[in-house]
Amino acid sequence: MNESSESPPPSRTFSSLPYDIILNCLARVSRYHYPTLSLVSKEFQSLIASRELYATRSRIGKTERFLYICLNLTKSNPKYRWFTLPPVPNEQKLLPVPLFTYHLNSSTVSSTDSEIYIIGGLVWGNRSKKASIFDCRSHQTRRLPKMRFPRASAAAHVIDGKIYVIGGGEIRGEVYDPTTQTWLTTPVDHTTEECQKVYDKHGVNICFVEIDNLLCQTFVFNGKLYWRHPRGDDFGWARVKGVEQELFRNHLSYVDKSGGGRRVTVWWKSVVVFGCQGLGYSTEFDTEIWCAEISFERRGLKELWGFVEWSRKVFTCKGCDSPTDFVMDSVLVTY
């Protein structure tokens, strides 16, 4: 038989590959693309929602850190909305998190793996014992047993899978064990140093970042970025150098960790006016949410330099009713 007349070998589709190979391939793709991939077929949708996929990502070292942030975009009728900021170069933008709306005023958030804990808060002005957990993979929220003490604006930290909580109007600490699903009272001395440092912020938005094995404090004041060594008695707060010319026109309002080690994200908003009518007045506005990621470099004992890695608009909402303190909370999630 003439070779040219032979039928070509049948082509193999992606879904015909062995299951383990499919998981390995998908695990190497950024989670940013998973919503799009889930639209390919029901099989893909099932694979992307499977625990096996995330176990594979963890096993081959392909987990990613996503920043989840809660915004209050309406001052007249406060309604908190959660977003995620994927770590995708040149494509940073806030994506709404579906089915994640629960967030009491003055509650505390902490995370372990793909789960976000929401602890305490204010209900009609009273501190709450409520606690819940949101699974970022399944987008499901479930209630946890109530805490032993009501708290608002407490501090929380995860150690060995257990949630340690202190402060928030109660001098006693407590710890939640997911295995037994119980809260137990614990001395404050038994909580971690990191948790104690967060508790010391007294309501001020202070972010801790490790730079050259030194844990530094950073915070925003009057729209400027400051830093200090929390145990340094010889000098206080100092301006972060190098970012003044980059961001001096923007009134920074919030600072938090990013997924890049010695880096932070800073947040601000601006109002855009358009469609002027009559005497130049306009009732049409857009509120733009901006974000920048800043990396740090120490130069001597008393100088910290900042470098803007990227800066861009990440979200736009209609109107200009967004409150000044529009960032309610944020947390890093790894999976």
From Swiss-Prot:
The keyword Repeat applies. The keyword Hydrolase does not apply. Kelch repeats lie at residues 115-161, 163-211. Keywords: Kelch repeat, Repeat. InterPro entries: F-box-like_dom_sf (IPR036047), F-box/kelch-repeat_ARATH (IPR050354), F-box_dom (IPR001810), Kelch-typ_b-propeller (IPR015915), Kelch_1 (IPR006652). SMART domains: FBOX, Kelch. Residues 11-57 form the F-box domain. PANTHER family: F-BOX ASSOCIATED DOMAIN-CONTAINING PROTEIN, F-BOX/KELCH-REPEAT PROTEIN SKIP4. This is Putative F-box/kelch-repeat protein At5g02980.
